[in-house]
Structures are given as structure tokens and as C-alpha cells.
Amino acid sequence: GGVNGPRGWATCNYVVASSMQEAVLIDLAAKVRPGVPVVFLDTGYHFAETIGTRDAIESVYDIRVLNVTPEHSVAEQDKLLGKDLFARDPGECCRLRKVAPLGKTLRGYSAWVTGLRRSEAATRANAPVIGFDEGFKLVKVNPMATWTDEDVQNYIDEHNVLVNPLIYEGYSSIGCAPCTAKPLAGADPRSGRWQGLAKTECGLHAS
């Protein structure tokens, strides 16, 4: 089906990806298409709060959570590649635990929908609302690309949207626990990710 307007979105074969940081995108998607599949990349390294948020979101919204896990558990990866790969080669850890599992999951779909926003970081400043994802070879839709932090907060307040409690502890961008810290004062919201490393993206949004 086409992707022009809500009717097109209701019929197009797409999946929503969520980090379970907040449920704004999920709230929007569930209203347009009840029962929409939502991918959550369960890396094995998440904060307990993130897993709790995922479970709460799944019980509150009319969605179908696809809990996607990597080929190997953390313990298996430690045995195969040595302990704490994230500390030695974060790029490879993200590839194995996020990018590859998502790639496999997306094979059955014609588009994926993300909560990517231009205001999150310089690396995302040119994010299109609709584009073609060269990495995963399918249409990528970022319906919130132009939203500001204020827009997100207003929507959360207005619609009583579920939020990961870590947000209120000062974490503005939440990923795997070992690679997530609170952002630096005055820096962009994603500055707490991979602090001290020359890395700003996990690779899911590389293209």
C-alpha cells in the first residue's frame, strides 16, 4: 500500500522501532494502526528500568511487542569474544547486539518507523521525515524528525504518555546500561552515550 496519509499507513507493511525511552511514537502509531508491531532490541545490557518500561508499555498500548534478541547471550558473547566487548570494541558490540538482529527482523517489512529527531544530536540534524535506508534496504520513516524536546514533553504531558523513569533522573538518551551516562552540562541530549569514545551512534541510524 501507499504511504500517503493515515489510510496508507494503516495498510502499509511496516514496523515501529522503539528504545522504550518514552512511548510518544508508540502512542501515535497505536492510534493510527491498533496492534502495530513494535520492535524492541533486547540486547541483554538494558537497565532494569528500560525492561520495566517495555513491559508497562506493552500492557497499556494496543501494540504487539517483538522482543528481538541477539544470536548470542551476553555470557556466550563473553566466552566467544572476551568479556565486556562494549569496552574494547563498542562498534562491534552494537553491530552484534543491535544492528544484525534488527536487520534480520526488518526483512519481512517494507518500511520501518523510528522516533529519530533532528534536535537530538548534530549527527541527526538532517534526518528526513521519509527516506530510504541504504543499510537495511527499505523505506525509513521518522515522523517525529522535526519535533523539538518541548514538543515531545508537551505530548507526554497532554496524553499522559508512559516514560522511562531514568529520564527523570537526568538521562536524556537511554541505551545499554554500560554505555549510557547522564549528558554533559550544556551538551546535546545524546552526549551521555559512549562517553569518552569517538562514537555517537549505534549504527542503526547510520544512513
Model-based region annotation:
Residues 1-207:
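Nucleotide-activated chemistry modules centered on ATP-dependent adenylation/adenylyltransferase
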